[in-house]
C-alpha cells in the first residue's frame, strides 16, 4: 500500500489504481476513495496472510534501519525495475518512502 500511495500522486497511475478497485468491486465515490479502499483491501489480505504491516514489524532494528536506509534507497533507485515505476523517484524520496514503510506512517509526498 505504501508504494501505491506514492504512485497515486501520478494522475495516470491513480486512475489505474481506481480502475483496479472498481473491478474488484470496492467502494468509493471518487478516485481517492477508491485508492484508499484498494489499500485497505491489501492491508486486509496482508493480515490474513500474516504479512507484517511495517519493516519494523519484520524485526528490523531501528538503529540498523537508520544506519542503512540511505544506501538501500540509493541502490533501490539504481535498480533496473525502478525505472518502470509509474512515478519517478530519487534517492531522497526513496529514503522517505522506506521510512514510511519502516514506521507505518502515511505517504504524503
Predicted feature locations:
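Short, amphipathic C-terminal "tail helix"
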Residues: 64-109
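Gly/Pro-rich interdomain helix-loop hinge
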Residues: 1-67, 107
Amino acid at each position: 500500500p505504501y508504494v501505491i500511495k506514492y504512485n497515486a500522486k501520478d494522475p495516470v497511475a491513480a486512475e489505474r489504481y481506481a480502475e483496479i478497485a472498481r473491478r474488484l468491486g470496492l467502494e468509493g465515490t471518487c478516485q481517492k476513495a477508491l485508492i484508499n479502499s484498494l489499500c485497505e483491501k491489501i492491508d486486509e489480505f496482508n493480515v490474513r496472510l500474516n504479512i507484517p504491516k511495517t519493516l519494523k514489524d519484520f524485526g528490523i532494528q531501528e538503529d540498523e534501519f537508520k544506519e542503512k536506509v540511505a544506501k538501500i534507497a540509493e541502490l533501490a533507485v539504481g535498480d533496473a525495475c525502478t525505472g518502470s515505476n509509474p512515478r519517478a523517484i530519487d534517492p531522497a524520496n526513496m529514503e522517505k518512502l522506506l521510512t514510511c514503510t519502516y514506521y507505518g506512517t502515511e505517504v504524503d509526498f
